[in-house]
Amino acid sequence: MALFRNGNGIAWARRRALVWALFALAFCAAMNIYHYSLQGARGLYLWDKTWLFRILILMGLLPLGLLALSLPLEKIKTKAPSKLLRGFSLVSSFLVSLASLGILAFLIAAPRMGELRKADLNLIDPSIKLESSSRLYDDQEMLLRLSVGSDAHWGTEKTDSNARSNILATIAENKPDLFFLLGDTVETGSSVSQWNAALSDLSAIVPKVPLRPLMGNHDALFGGQYLFKKAFFPEAFSSDSGSPYYYSIETKVATLVALNLPWGTENFDRKQRTWLEEVLKTADPLKPIIVFSHSYFYASGYDDPDLDKPWYDHYQNIPALTPIFERYGVDLVVSGHNHYMEFLEHNEVRYAIVGAMGSKSDPVPAHVSPASKWIAVATFGHVNINITKDYIVVEFKDQLGKTLHEERIRYLPSLESGSNERSPQA
């Protein structure tokens, strides 16, 4: 071996550097593939403007790049430059390998370490038909009463915890048939302590309110999907889609549809699209259809300096999903993600933004959506949706329950003979 090294020292050093560079590349690839497979992670690679997640991909190529640069230098008389680059390649291989394995271990272990507190919540199984109670509203019988909030962001000091608690107390007092939390319940999805803080407050303030949370992009961070399922989707639960992240809920008076859109369409694959179209196509034409998601569709907003894409009128969601909503006559789409409250309308489909459940408000919109009809900025609150036999009544409430804005949507089913598809409302 010594003779081999002495006679072929450069070739041996080159092979050694190559082997370690390939190990580093393999470890880096394994880490990125695992991370990319997690719910919501694809959005980080697409939306992050800091290059952090691009660096996570490219760092695996660094050792090979340094080794490649050393090859032409082997032809010059002085061997020191090529030797130095091979040394840098070896060192970077070790560092990249350690970083990749460390990140991989964190992604696997962090959301699985620690115990979630036992929560006293009235979680709703999406597979079970929702029963509703009746109540008079302006001399009309309310057939279904929903409350909706989003972007509570437990775990960050940027959230107004008093406003969040006030909103929950107002919802508890309203006693809805179902309370939808549309995501970003916590700031960092892999943090057990943040989930426990959320579960503690929810258990204390809305323990008896029927609850159905969706997963937002912050909830999904770094493997947060596992804690989301532990907290809000017990093993005994099931759904018509087979997924805990998107499903429909049948009621006597409405079809409720929850989508998995943490950032945008990164998780809106063929399976979810096919399921969605089938649900909408076969929906009872005598019932209104209400769709819920975390990320928005039409919305006012701004250009966020920390992001690589416009934070308004969603450039992915609009072309991918709004034609489906219009084709099948969806009545109302409710989303969070933007920290405003806003009501919009486009092609006779109504959209509500409700991302104001205590988290720091987004700045005054630099871009006002052409679809916008009303907006409240720097105002905390939630939305109540009351369904009567003729109308969907959408009430935007402030943190103390005062009505800020109200919309009445008359839902008209398709009565075309022989057609199961719904048509847009007149």
Language-model segment annotations:
Residues 178, 219, 297-299, 360:
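Feature marks short, surface-exposed loop/turn motifs that line or immediately flank catalytic pockets
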Residues 151, 183-184, 216-217, 294, ...:
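Active-site glycine-centered loops adjacent to acidic/histidine catalytic or metal-binding residues
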Residues 176-179, 330:
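Proline-aspartate-enriched helix->loop->beta-strand connector
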Residues 1-159, 165-177, 203, 208, ...:
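Acidic, histidine-bearing metal-coordination/catalytic regions of metal-dependent phosphoesterases
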Residues 154, 186-187, 219, 255, ...:
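Short active-site segment of divalent metal-dependent hydrolases/proteases
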Residues 155-161, 187-193, 264-268:
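Acidic-and-aromatic substrate-binding clefts and catalytic sites of carbohydrate-active enzymes
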